[in-house]
Amino acid sequence: MNRLIIVCLVAAMIYSTIALPMKEDISNDERPISVNEEPVKKNAAVAGAVIQGATLTFQVLDRILTVLGDISRKIAIGVDNESGRKWTAKNAYFFSGTSDVVLPYSVPNGKAFLYDGKKTRGPVATGAVGVLAYSMSDGNTLGILFSVPYDYNWYENWWNIKVYSGSKRANKWMYENLYYNASPHKGDNGWHEKSLGYGLKSRGYMASSGQTKLEIRVTRA
C-alpha cells in the first residue's frame, strides 16, 4: 500500500512539472521590442536645455515660442558660447514677468543655452523684462538684458549684453545698468555687434514684436 502511495506521488510531481512550466521573468529592461515599436527620441531644443552652438537657429526659438502658448508678451532666448570659456549660471532676475524654466546651469564652450520669459498670468499689464547672469571661468560675469514691454505706445523691445569685472548677480541694479547706461540695442529686426572687452565680442538679433526671439553669439574678439 505504501509503495502504491509513493508511486502516485511521484507521478503527480512529474505531471505538474510538465503541465506547469516555470514562469519566465522578463524585466522591463530586457523586454523584447516589437517590430512596430520605435525608440522615443527626446527633443533637446527646449527652453532650459543646452545644445550645440551650431544648431541654434531661429527655428529652434520659434518652437520655444510655440510651446509657451497663446501669451501676448513672451520671448525665446538663445545664447551661443564661443568665448573659449565655461559659463556657470548665477541667477535670473525679472523686473517684469516670469519664467517657469530653470536657467541652464553649465554652458561649456561651443554650446548654447535656451531660456524663455513671459508676462505674468492673468489680466495684468506686464511684459517680460529681466536680466540673466553667468559666471565665466575667467572670474568675470556675463550679464544679458531682455525687455519685451506690455505697452508699445510708450516702450520698445530692447536687449543688451555686458561683461562685468568679478562676480555679480542679476538684480535691479544690473537691470538698470544694462537698460539705461550700457548702450542697449533696440529690438528692431536687425543684427547688432559690439566689443565686450576682455577679449570678447557679441553679435545679436531681436525681433520687434510682442512675441519675440533673441539670439546672441559671444565669440573671441
From Swiss-Prot:
GO BP annotations listed: cytolysis in another organism; monoatomic cation transport; pore complex assembly
Keywords annotated in UniProt: Cleavage on pair of basic residues, Cytolysis, Membrane, Nematocyst, Secreted, Signal, Target cell membrane, Target membrane, Toxin
Subcellular location: Secreted; Nematocyst; Target cell membrane
Residue positions of motif Cell attachment site, crucial for protein stability: 186-188
Record-listed phosphocholine binding positions: S96, V129, S147, P149, Y175, Y179, Y180
Signal peptide residues on this chain, from the entry's feature table: 1-19
GO cellular component, one term: pore complex
Tissue-specificity statement: Expressed in actinopharynx and in gastric filaments. Is not expressed in tentacles.
Function: May be involved in digestion of prey. Pore-forming protein that forms cations-selective hydrophilic pores of around 1 nm and causes cytolysis. Pore formation is a multi-step process that involves specific recognition of membrane sphingomyelin (but neither cholesterol nor phosphatidylcholine) using aromatic rich region and adjacent phosphocholine (POC) binding site, firm binding to the membrane (mainly driven by hydrophobic interactions) accompanied by the transfer of the N-terminal region to the lipid-water interface and finally pore formation after oligomerization of monomers.
Classification via PANTHER family: BRYOPORIN
Quaternary assembly: Octamer or nonamer in membranes. Monomer in the soluble state.
Domain commentary: Composed of a long N-terminal alpha-helix and a core region rich in beta-sheet structures. Before the pore formation, the alpha-helix binds the lipid membrane, partitions into the lipid-water interface and stabilizes the monomeric molecule on the membrane. Finally, it traverses the bilayer, thus forming the transmembrane pore.
Protein name: Deep sea actinoporin Cjtox II
Origin species: Cribrinopsis japonica
